[in-house]
Amino acid sequence: MERLMRLTILLFLGAVLAGCASVPSTSAPQAIGTVERPVPSNLPKPSPGMDPDVLLREFLKATADPANRHLAARQFLTESASNAWDDAGSALLIDHVVFVETRSAEKVSVTMRADILGSLSDVGVFETAEGQLPDPGPIELVKTSDGWRIDRLPNGVFLDWQQFQETYKRNTLYFADPTGKTVVPDPRYVAVSDRDQLATELVSKLLAGPRPEMARTVRNLLAPPLRLRGPVTRADGGKSGIGRGYGGARVDMEKLSTTDPHSRQLLAAQIIWTLARADIRGPYVINADGAPLEDRFAEGWTTSDVAATDPGVADGAAAGLHALVNGSLVAMDAQRVTPVPGAFGRMPEQTAAAVSRSGRQVASVVTLGRGAPDEAASLWVGDLGGEAVQSADGHSLSRPSWSLDDAVWVVVDTNVVLRAIQDPASGQPARIPVDSTAVASRFPGAINDLQLSRDGTRAAMVIGGQVILAGVEQTQAGQFALTYPRRLGFGLGSSVVSLSWRTGDDIVVTRTDAAHPVSYVNLDGVNSDAPSRGLQTPLTAIAANPSTVYVAGPQGVLMYSASVESRPGWADVPGLMVPGAAPVLPG
């Protein structure tokens, strides 16, 4: 029965994942219950005078520490209950807990009610959720010589939300994208109270591999048989102050099978960006089988040595801001607007466009008879400043999005996802369908927007006003498929109009919600609202990079930049305050 109840809860959770919850923005992650380490000092312990209700609440807080198979939480159990309790698998994060008791002198039976706010997998993957906790089954407490103890409880882990926020922190692992051009974020939550153990924990997670849904979308240069020889230390071998000051970090591994220089560079990039983003500072001494990973970096690597893979760099930054004004593509030059040379500066009726991630090409949608029964759309692709070739057509086309391999992704007639490429043999345009069966079966409806992440391994879509995220997987036959779709940002409701990736971990959306017309949502599913001062609705298109968000409103294009937060609100983009103008960035 307990196994059936756990299955029921997991099925229920699968239906409600991607809800809205507030999660720490600075954070660190660990496979639950696998690491031997000191118990955090803020965790409660049972005491003889605890009332059953208090003891249960303190038990839920103690489950926040996964170390040694939840040893801290097991102190609240009788020996028989501890032996029977299966704490493996995902934890449910719960809040607003209510206990309903049936009491006798020596025994208390309890049923638990609570709100589900999310789940935490056994590898530290957090996803938001919303809904009521199904009845997990009875909880029984008995009086012992040491006070009340839990003698029966459901299998699985129920984790107190507030204690989760205090104990777990968010960090990001990085894996290589399939092209080897950049690294891909994989956010994790870990509970590490000793800062000097964090580097070892994060590298161990890299060695264990990406979250399951990313297994076929990224490469892991730290895959087995590679393993750590021992804990990560300071660069000089010291065991304290790792990654602080000028101490750096030293990673010693063994059983390295990677030989080519580019793969070794990617391996180093995975380690360096994972540690650097966790504020574990270099230099990073990386050794394999008793020798430096690269002789030229024997004294240590820095982030500059792997800058080409920097996950925070804006794609095609040199290309700058472009826009569609009166149906043609223009470029911004020192706050002056000039039509781009070539086809894209001449063609009328352009309704959506994107510059390639290299900044050298353009994909643009031309729509004739917009809104009419005979509306027709066509996709044109070519060099920025050059001529264009028609690459796809249909009754309607979504805003195009570029992948790292210079393919253009577009949705034809709201439900057919295509990759438009230049055929290597003939040089002619080729249209290759993308398998979107998994998306259509779980989230049926029109795909109104589709944008690829900067690393090309994820696709964010707007379906029915909701943000849907899917993995981009290349099959053995060389085809592409959208896999593992899930909803992000339940708190956004069904108000989303368009979206853009701000970073590899952060999406910004426009909404029909007049009070919150622009919002953010991250890969965990956590959403938050952007400032709305200075915005007029409705907003249509949106384009973003790590530093700036641009939106198309009734009066033209406006911008919000993190660098000018001392002056909150949105600012006009000079030259683009034209009704119908839409921002265009690489991506």
From Swiss-Prot:
Main location: membrane
Topology class, membrane: Lipid-anchor
Lipid positions (S-diacylglycerol cysteine): 20
Disulfide bridge map: none
Signal peptide annotation: 1-19
One GO cellular component term: extracellular region
Pfam families: Germane, Gmad1
Function: May modulate activity of the MtrAB system in controlling homeostasis of the cell wall and cell division. Partially restores antibiotic resistance to M.smegmatis in which this gene has been disrupted.
NCBIfam families associated with the record: PRK13616.1
Protein family: Belongs to the LpqB lipoprotein family.
Subunit: Interacts with MtrB, probably extracytoplasmically.
UniProt-recorded name of the protein: Lipoprotein LpqB
Phylogenetic classification of the source organism: Bacteria, Bacillati, Actinomycetota, Actinomycetes, Mycobacteriales
